[in-house]
Every structure is written in structure tokens, then in C-alpha cells.
Regions:
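Conserved beta-strand in the GNAT
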Residues: 68-85
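Conserved beta-hairpin
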Residues: 57-72, 447
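Conserved acetyl-CoA pyrophosphate-binding loop and the N-cap/start of the following alpha-helix
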Residues: 90-102, 195, 199
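Long, hydrophobic/aromatic-enriched structural stretches that serve as scaffold segments
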Residues: 406-463
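Phosphate-rich cofactor/ligand-interacting catalytic cores and adjacent structured alpha/beta frameworks
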Residues: 357-423, 461-594, 600, 622
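Short amphipathic alpha-helix that is part of the acyltransferase structural core
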Residues: 11-14, 21-53, 63, 69
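Conserved GNAT acetyl-CoA-binding A-motif
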Residues: 107-119
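Nucleotidyltransferase catalytic core that binds NTPs
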Residues: 119, 124-132, 136-359
């Protein structure tokens, strides 16, 4: 017996068991979807039951030891059971029960104590007999869960928040006043824009209490922690607005996976209806909410369809017109595109001031990725090889960058103030960031120099965002002076590559360390390298970062070169970089890379300055 194709790609096919025994010739095996032949076996098996293979982390199958045939199988993705089927002729043998029990045990072992599953409505009683409880239902599918916590725990947390807010409102109201209705907005805020702010303002004016639920799924450009903090800071002045935690029960990959694919499919309506039913059954009652607010959607087909189903399903849905800037609706995607183009000036008019530190931090992280991905580079890690480094590669460098990002956010928030932050707080965050980087890379120092330089620049950029008038027509000068003021608080260092190189060179030359350059506000960078890079970008030069790196190498006292070789070698490297810049070619860069690898040379200080140039270009370009 075959089921009809299910519109929900991770829907279950399940038959009622009539026996408690499993044939002795069957054993549970793990099949790997990453192995083409095993994946094909799973897909063929599921297709016989009218199902499709969805994303799973683990797939278990009951396999007949004699024939090798899959008799029953099921998958697990995080805490969701998916793609369960029993082969024709084997229904009624309790095989699906065996598979589901195995998957629940697996999920529990991975720390998931509440497990969800999708199935067809006709299987509800069966799963209720197995201790699953209904979460939501749609015409073609239902969502159930079993275990401790789950929707009950989340609903209780929401009820407590609602009770606290109602008590506070009652205490400030007259004795005869009745508390007005509450409303809800569910938003991704990736990032929080002026459009989101306008929606919240308009909604808050229509209800006594407005709850803003942040989509918790961490698959956006901005992390859940960043997005929730962004919204909280962005609505802090609105007394009747409360930002609450999101969950797996509101626009998540568990309830609404196609939302994150941003495309309509035959599964979309079912997922939307399940998500809306979950909201109506559990979230709205827990918050005492009677109104759902959404922004109008003129372009995205999936969101538009979701809004229409919401209006047809929920009792009171109010659609707010999108806020526009320069005749176009403000959207998070416009802001993200500005970041991709490395332009804070294009993003800033679209967001509240409280969002700016998060954008600045992301530009810093993007600058590190741009430097890393600039290929080829002489002696440095790039997307093609490890240069002269035996202890790090592209993947390790990326781990270091990801580890540093939350600290760039903290530094930007620290700098976003009228006064420069205390030196001790700057150092404290920097040391935490360094420890996080080393933990992520297995002890490899991937970005210590870049952390110092970019950390100062991030603080300066965030500080500058609060002094738009003071910056006037010369943002680079303001940024340079701010960086110099921050660096002046750092004492002379001992034991670093830069300090040792200065001592070594002192009989014949005077070198500047990374701290010396910072104390000067990176004067050469602002006067030379940044304008050079900007000119190459305006000329649409695809080799702009490569040429800029060579320009920096030709002028910077790169103490990394001295550390690996000598002052004389550093002088030779400057000459070679200048010659290649004057007669630039990619084969020439590749030849320099081979030479540097043979000589164990790595211009790491120049790479740090390239990251700085890319970042500051994004901050200062108009």
C-alpha cells in the first residue's frame, strides 16, 4: 500500500502496528545521505511510499540481513523526526514504532528532550497512544511532539511575561481602568530597519501592550543574539513594547522551513497553516494577544502568501503599509545589499541609529574575509594555498574570523557613545576576543594583529557615528585622530614581533611597530593606501585588493618579515613589491608567492593593513 505524495517534504508515512515483535533478520543501520549510493537507496525507498527525502542529520533503516532490502526507515534533523516509512507488505509489524523509538532515543542522547514529528492527520490517534501530543494541524499534516519542556515550557514563559507586564500596567492605571488588548509582531529583523521601527510604532499606538517576537532560527546574516539586542535597543523608548524570545514554535525551520528558502513550493501552504495554527493555539493565548500585526509585502511572493493566509486564519490581522525612503520600501535586504557593497553610507539612512554599531561590526568581519579571500597573495593564506604558513589554512582562518565577530559587535557598542570608552574596557574585550580566537583555532594566532588594528578602527567608526557634525567634511581625519587617541593609552610593548624587530633594526634603521602606527592614527593608511584603494575601486579594478596589498608592502615596515628573516630582507621585499606594482600581473603575484614560500616569508602586517583599508573604505565612502 502506497501513500499519496505528501505536500510536506518531511511528512511521515506510518501504519498502525498489530504486533510487538520485529523479525529476527532485521537490524537497524545508519545510512549516510552524504554517500551518493546510500542516499539513492533512501530516496528509492521513500519514493515507494510517496515521500521525498528532506534534510536530515541522521537516517536509520531496518534492513533485512538476508536480502539487504530496507524494510523501514526514518530520519532525524535536530529534534525533528522526518521521512518515516514502512515498505509494502510489512505494515502491522510494529516496525515504524521501532524506528521512531530508536530516533527518539538518538535525539535524547544528543540533548533533545522534546522531540517533534510531522504526520498525516489520520495518524493522530496512533501517535497520541505513543505519548505524542498535538501542537498544530493543517488539512494535510499535523505537527506533534513528545518529551519534557516543549511548547508547554515556552507558553509558560510567555504567560509569566504577560502577567508581569499586565501587573505593571495595572499598577500605573486608575482603579476603574480596564487593560486594553495586546498585539504581537513576529519579525526576523535581519537587521532592524526604519521599516521595522515604523511598524512597531504604528502597532504600539493601537494596543495597550505590544509583544515583538524575534525569529530565533540562526541562519541569517545577523545572529539571533544580535537581532534580538538590535530590536531591544531600537524600541527601548516605547513603554508599551516588550521584546520576547523566539522559539522553534514561531517561524522556524521546524514549523516553516520554506520561509528560509524564500520560495513558494507545494509544501508552503501546509507549513504556513501549521505555523499560524501553532500561533493561534499556543502563543497568542499565552500572551493574551488578540491582534497580529504585519507589514505589507509588495515584492516577496512567499511573505505575501503568508500574510494572506494569516488574514484568512486569524481573527484580527492588521496590515501596516511599508515605510519608504527615496521612493522605495525600506527592507532588511536593502541594508544587507549595502553591506555586500561595503557601504555604510548606503545602509545608514535605512536603519535607526541604534542599528549602526552592528553594521559597523559586520563591515569589519567582511573586511577580514575580503583579505583572506584575496587570491593569490605572496606568502599569505588565501583560497588557493597556505602561503608560508604550516600551522594555518583557509578553514582555520575562517574559524578565527567567526570567533572574533561577536567581539567586534561589543567593541562597536562600546564605542557608540559621545565619549571614548575607558581604556580598561577596551583591553578587557580585546583579551576576551584573543582567547576566543585561540580556542576556535586550536591555539593558532590567526588574527592578533588584525584584532588590535580593527578593534581600534571599529570603536572609532562607532564613535564617529555619534559625531556626524563633528566629522564634517573630513571623516578620515576624525577617524585617524580618534584611533590615535585610543592607541595613546596603550603602553609600550615588549616581546611582540614589532618590539623585537625595532630592537634588532636599531643599529641601522628606525622601524615603526604596529603600536607606533596606531599612535600616529595610521597616517600613511589614510593619506595613501585608502585613497589608492578607493581609486582602484572607482575604476572597477578587479585586482584592487591585490594592488593595494603590494602598495602597502612597498611602504610598510612589516615586522612580520623581520621576525621571519631580517631587516635587509624587509627592505628587499619593499623593492620587489614596488617593482611588481609598477608592472602588475597575476602570474607575477604567483611567482612572488612561490618565492616567499621558499624563503618562509609572510607579510602579515601588510595583510592586517589591507583589512583595515577595506574596512575604512566601507566606513568612509560616499
Amino acid at each position: 500500500m502506497k501513500s499519496n505524495p505528501c505536500p510536506l517534504t518531511h511528512c511521515l508515512f506510518f501504519e498502525s502496528p498489530h504486533s510487538l515483535k520485529t523479525p529476527a533478520t532485521l537490524e537497524i543501520l545508519q545510512l549516510h545521505t552524504s554517500i551518493p549510493r546510500q542516499r539513492a537507496r533512501i530516496e528509492q525507498f521513500l519514493a515507494a511510499s510517496g515521500l521525498r527525502l528532506d534534510e536530515v542529520d541522521y537516517y536509520a533503516a531496518l534492513v533485512d540481513e538476508e536480502s539487504g532490502d530496507i524494510i523501514a526507515g526514518g530520519g532525524l534533523w535536530r529534534d525533528i523526526i522526518k521521512c518515516v516509512a514502512v515498505a509494502d507488505g510489512h505494515q502491522g509489524e510494529a516496525l515504524a514504532n521501532t524506528i521512531v523509538s530508536h530516533l527518539i532515543a538518538r535525539a535524547n542522547a544528543e540533548g533533545h528532550h522534546c522531540v517533534k514529528l510531522y504526520t498525516k492527520p489520520q495518524n493522530r490517534q496512533l501517535f497520541e497512544s505513543l505519548s505524542f501530543r498535538l501542537l498544530a494541524e493543517a488539512p494535510q499534516a499535523i505537527l506533534m511532539e513528545t518529551g519534557v519542556g516543549g511548547i508547554g515550557k515556552y507558553s509558560q514563559a510567555l504567560r509569566l511575561i504577560s502577567a508581569e507586564r499586565q501587573a505593571a500596567a495595572a499598577a500605573s492605571a486608575t482603579a476603574s481602568a480596564t487593560l486594553p488588548q495586546a498585539g504581537v509582531i513576529v519579525m526576523n529583523a535581519n537587521p532592524f530597519t526604519l521599516g521595522h521601527r515604523r511598524l512597531v510604532e504604528q502597532a504600539a499606538a493601537q494596543v495597550g501592550m505590544l509583544y515583538v517576537v524575534i525569529v530565533k532560527e540562526d541562519c541569517s546574516v545577523f545572529s539571533y543574539a544580535e537581532r534580538k539586542d538590535m530590536v531591544s535597543r531600537g524600541v527601548a523608548d516605547l513603554a508599551n513594547v516588550c521584546v520576547v524570545d523566539g522559539s522553534d514554535y514561531a517561524v522556524s525551520k521546524a514549523t516553516f522551513p520554506t520561509y528560509f528558502l524564500k520560495r513558494l513550493s507545494d509544501a508552503s501552504d501546509t507549513q504556513m497553516l501549521l505555523d499560524l495554527d501553532l500561533y493561534g493555539r499556543h502563543i497568542a493565548p499565552a500572551l493574551g494577544a488578540t491582534v497580529r500585526f504585519v507589514g505589507s509585502e509588495p515584492t516577496d511572493a512567499l511573505t505575501c502568501r503568508y500574510n494572506k493566509l494569516m488574514q484568512a486564519t486569524l481573527p484580527d490581522v492588521r496590515v501596516m503599509q511599508r515605510y519608504e525612503v527615496d521612493g522605495e520600501p525600506v527592507s532588511a535586504s536593502r541594508v544587507r545589499m549595502a553591506l555586500v557593497k561595503n557601504s555604510l553610507s548606503a545602509a545608514a539612512p535605512l536603519v535607526p541609529p541604534t542599528t549602526l554599531p552592528y553594521l559597523i561590526a559586520h563591515l569589519a568581519t567582511r573586511a577580514l574575509r575580503t583579505e583572506l579571500n584575496t587570491t593569490p597573495k605572496p606568502g599569505l593564506v588565501d583560497s588557493r594555498d597556505n602561503g608560508s604558513h604550516t600551522d594555518m589554512d583557509h578553514a582555520i582562518m575562517m574559524r578565527g574570523i567567526r570567533a572574533l565577530h561577536p567581539f567586534f559587535v561589543r567593541l562597536a557598542l562600546l564605542g557608540y557613545a559621545p565619549q571614548l570608552p575607558p581604556h580598561g574596557e577596551v583591553v578587557g574585550i580585546g583579551l576576551e576576543a584573543e582567547r576566543a580566537m585561540l580556542a576556535a583555532t586550536g591555539g593558532v594566532n590567526t588574527h592578533k594583529g588584525a584584532l588590535f588594528a580593527l578593534g581600534l578602527a571599529v570603536i572609532a567608526a562607532a564613535h564617529a557615528a555619534t559625531h556626524a557634525t563633528a566629522m564634517g567634511a573630513n571623516p578620515p581625519a576624525f577617524l585617524s585622530a580618534t584611533i590615535a587617541a585610543l592607541a595613546a593609552a596603550f603602553p609600550d610593548t615588549q616581546g611582540t614581533h614589532g618590539s623585537r624587530a625595532k630592537v634588532e633594526a636599531s643599529p641601522v634603521a628606525t622601524l615603526k611597530s604596529a603600536l607606533d602606527n596606531a599612535r600616529e592614527g595610521y597616517a600613511r593608511l589614510f593619506a595613501d593606501w585608502l585613497p589608492f584603494y578607493a581609486a582602484r575601486r572607482r575604476a572597477n579594478d578587479t585586482y584592487a585588493p591585490h594592488r593595494t596589498l603590494l602598495r602597502i608592502m612597498a611602504e610598510l615596515d612589516d615586522t612580520n618579515i623581520v621576525h621571519r628573516s631580517s631587516v635587509d630582507t624587509m627592505i628587499q621585499v619593499k623593492m620587489q613589491a614596488r617593482q611588481l606594482l609598477n608592472d602588475f600581473s597575476e602570474p607575477g603575484l604567483e611567482a612572488m608567492n612561490r618565492s616567499f614560500i621558499m624563503r618562509n616569508l609572510s607579510p602579515g602586517g601588510s595583510a592586517d593593513m589591507l583589512s583595515m583599508v577595506v574596512f575604512l573604505y566601507g566606513i568612509t565612502r560616499q
